[in-house]
Amino acid sequence: MNFEIEQILTQIIAFLIMLGVLKKFVWKRLLNLIEERKQLIQSEFDKIENQKEEVTKLSEEYKAKLHDIDAEARRRIQEAVVKGRDIAHDIEQETRQKVTSLLNNAQEEMKLELAQAKEQLKKDVINISFAITEKLIHEKVDISKHQKLVEEAVEQVEIR
């Protein structure tokens, strides 16, 4: 390997001249471009960080809203259940009152019909008694006739 000193010195001088020219004309622009790029990247990172914070904040707000909505839904369901129970209780009370009223009416009607039947039975017994007495007065009473009249009277009561 033959290295020539002139060639090495020429290349060192050329490198230093090139470095001087680059420093004078390009180095400041290059540093400015690097700084601008650094600031742009930093601003993008800041934007990303802000967006992350905003997303986190919105996420927490949505979670809080969902919690509130769930609580409201549970409250409304509970109100509906209570209202349904109240309505069921009212219907049950109303039905009990109607049943009691119908039962009382039926009992009153039965009492009335029983009273009418008793009254009719009294009238029938009186009529039969009059009929028996009338026959007894018109005819001479003997035991067999008396027995026959009673049987006829009972048959008349059964027919009616």
Swiss-Prot record:
This protein's record includes keyword Lyase: no
What's an example GO cellular component term for this entry?
Answer: proton-transporting ATP synthase complex
Q: Which GO terms describe its molecular function?
A: proton-transporting ATP synthase activity, rotational mechanism; proton-transporting ATPase activity, rotational mechanism
Indicate how the chain sits in the lipid bilayer.
Answer: Single-pass membrane protein
Pfam families tied to this protein? ATP-synt_B
List UniProt keywords, sorted A-Z.
Answer: ATP synthesis, Cell inner membrane, Cell membrane, CF(0), Hydrogen ion transport, Ion transport, Membrane, Transmembrane, Transmembrane helix, Transport
Its main localization is: membrane
Write out the transmembrane intervals. Answer: 5-27
Q: Where in the cell is it found?
A: Cell inner membrane
What the entry lists under CDD domains is as follows: ATP-synt_Fo_b
Name the InterPro entries for this protein.
ATP_synth_b/b'su_bac/chlpt, ATP_synth_F0_bsu_bac, ATP_synthase_B_chain
Question: What does the similarity note say?
Answer: Belongs to the ATPase B chain family.
Q: What biological function has been recorded for the protein in this entry?
A: F(1)F(0) ATP synthase produces ATP from ADP in the presence of a proton or sodium gradient. F-type ATPases consist of two structural domains, F(1) containing the extramembraneous catalytic core and F(0) containing the membrane proton channel, linked together by a central stalk and a peripheral stalk. During catalysis, ATP synthesis in the catalytic domain of F(1) is coupled via a rotary mechanism of the central stalk subunits to proton translocation.
Describe its assembly: F-type ATPases have 2 components, F(1) - the catalytic core - and F(0) - the membrane proton channel. F(1) has five subunits: alpha(3), beta(3), gamma(1), delta(1), epsilon(1). F(0) has three main subunits: a(1), b(2) and c(10-14). The alpha and beta chains form an alternating ring which encloses part of the gamma chain. F(1) is attached to F(0) by a central stalk formed by the gamma and epsilon chains, while a peripheral stalk is formed by the delta and b chains.
Recorded protein name is: ATP synthase subunit b
The gene coding this protein? atpF
